[in-house]
């Protein structure tokens, strides 16, 4: 059985250029596509198994990365954007017509990732952004209907692709969250 992770990585993870200056994310609409400009390269690019992230058809995982909030600009057809779930921590702005999530924004200034917007690098018109580095929330794909018996094979495929599987975020990101919480707790004490 072939394990499909995501079209952007199924045939191998493509390394970034190391000098990606940014580009334009484009939704899947053929008529009046939403276009979002991104300045600079992405960070913490990863395969995500959560049930909230947008995935293209046939993908088991999404591929998602972050960029500084100030580096995101809606360029065209912003009238087609709507927030998918206003109660979610990450406010995912999606095209009302095709459903593609264009960017996710955290509005809670106390959140460890406030100031970072979440994007799907495969939507770049340009090539060369930083490659996925790991896989997060791997067990969560079971919630979206994957048979738990397939998990060893899926984890093996992720490792084969060079995407270390975690059931939370990568250790560096978990350390950043814990550091933020510790710093905030000390201020409150």
UniProtKB/Swiss-Prot annotation:
Cofactor stoichiometry and binding remark: Binds 2 Zn(2+) ions per subunit.
Primary role: Catalyzes the condensation of formaldehyde and glutathione to S-hydroxymethylglutathione.
Single Gene Ontology BP annotation: formaldehyde catabolic process
Annotated positions binding Zn(2+) 1: 27, 29, 95, 98
Originating organism: Rhodopseudomonas palustris (strain BisA53)
Pathway annotation: One-carbon metabolism; formaldehyde degradation; formate from formaldehyde (glutathione route): step 1/3
Disulfide bonds: none
Keywords for the protein's UniProt record, in alphabetical order: Lyase, Metal-binding, Zinc
Annotated CENP-V/GFA domain residues: 20-167
EC class: lyase
Protein name: Glutathione-dependent formaldehyde-activating enzyme
Native organism taxonomy: Bacteria, Pseudomonadati, Pseudomonadota, Alphaproteobacteria, Hyphomicrobiales
Organism domain of life: Bacteria
InterPro entries: CENP-V/GFA, Formald_GSH, Mss4-like_sf
EC number of this enzyme: 4.4.1.22
Residues that coordinate or bind Zn(2+) 2: 48, 50, 53
GO molecular function: S-(hydroxymethyl)glutathione synthase activity; zinc ion binding
Family: Belongs to the Gfa family.
Cofactor: Zn(2+)
Catalytic activity of the protein: S-(hydroxymethyl)glutathione = glutathione + formaldehyde
